[in-house]
């Protein structure tokens, strides 16, 4: 009985996300206000839980979080559109800690085309 209880407790501990992971996901880490940035994509990592772009903006590197694969696809955004060397304009919520230089995208623009990832946010 004790072994089963210990196994259950350990399994739950492994399955539960860390405080850092919980704090990072969602919008609680952002300012709640929008910021617009334009820059050049330097690095791309797409996939779950969400895509990450490294974008050079006015000589500074920003971490830009795009949506989950299903959200990007729903907005009409194809993975191949987000590539190194592509100029991108993003509107979204920056990290409350501005020194983090991280932004969660609500809308992004590639050329003249707009992709709305979070239509219920402004």
PLM segments and residue spans:
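A short macromolecule-binding patch
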Residues: 60-69
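Short boundary/loop segments of OB/S1/cold-shock single-stranded nucleic-acid-binding domains
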Residues: 21-35
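Bacterial N-terminal signal peptides that target proteins for export
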Residues: 1-8
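OB-fold/S1-family single-stranded nucleic acid-binding modules
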Residues: 95-119
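Conserved hydrophobic positions within beta-strands
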Residues: 39-41
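Short nucleic-acid-contacting surface segments enriched for D/E, G, S/T with interspersed K/R
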Residues: 74-90
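Short aromatic-glycine-enriched beta-strand elements
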Residues: 47-56
């Amino acid at each position: 009985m004790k072994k089963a209880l210990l196994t259950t407790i350990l399994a739950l501990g492994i399955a539960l996300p860390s405080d850092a992971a919980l704090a990072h996901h969602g919008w609680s880490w952002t300012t709640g206000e929008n910021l617009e940035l334009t820059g050049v994509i330097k690095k791309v990592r797409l996939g779950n839980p969400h895509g990450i772009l490294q974008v050079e903006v006015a000589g500074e590197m920003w971490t830009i979080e795009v949506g989950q694969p299903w959200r990007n696809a729903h907005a009409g955004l194809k993975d191949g559109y987000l590539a190194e060397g592509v100029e991108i304009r993003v509107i979204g919520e920056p990290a409350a800690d501005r020194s983090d230089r991280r932004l969660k995208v609500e809308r992004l623009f590639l050329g003249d085309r707009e992709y709305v990832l979070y239509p219920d946010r402004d």
